[in-house]
Amino acid sequence: VHCMALLPHAREGEALPKRQTLYLLHGYGDSYTSWIRKTNLERYAAHHNLAVIMPDAQKSAYTDMTHGGKFFTYIADELPGKMRAFLPLSERREDTFIAGFSMGGYGAFKIGLARPMQYAAIGCISAGVSNDTPDTVALRELRTGGRPLKDTEEDVPASIARAAALGKDAPRIYHTIGQEDFLLSGARETRDLLCSYPGDPFHYIYEEKPGKHGWEFCDGALRDFLQWLSPAPR
């Protein structure tokens, strides 16, 4: 499986530290190279002194596929350890984040909430817990072979409920979508679900801004997410 890593340069006179790390997930029809090619990620990450790991997940919806790779297990359980073995990445939960665009935003919810003690924050751009479109419904049988996800680790609403029970230890969530996005209704349903838990355990931020479903909106949303994540450069 392909994966791309972006590491900030060590500053002059600085010993090579273990970096804060963002796992950044691509959308349907994109790949592990899309973030570098289609956004200003490299400049944003350098500003925040942040390492970024971008795995490829094909069109899996970050699922353990019946007819394909086990992408949920790979990214949730295998990839972090492998990356830390090769690269100077922090092992601390407070230094580890996950985010994504479109299908990757759904994947960030799925993985981040299934492993809430692994990530301090989750970012979802242009997506929601349900991203059903004719294309994704048609692919579901290929991904799951009819296997129900309810009450499994990949049941996102159930993962939300379990993570919310952590109270102040639940990961923070930043969620944004364009007002002209075709996935807007699913994002609003997700907003309503996350806001239904008393006490705001996720310190949930939801923003709708002018824009459609595409990289122009995504680039600005990525910049805003990283600013929310780390307001001051490190």
Predicted regions and their residues:
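Non-catalytic cap/lid and distal C-terminal segments of serine-dependent acyl enzymes
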Residues: 1-234
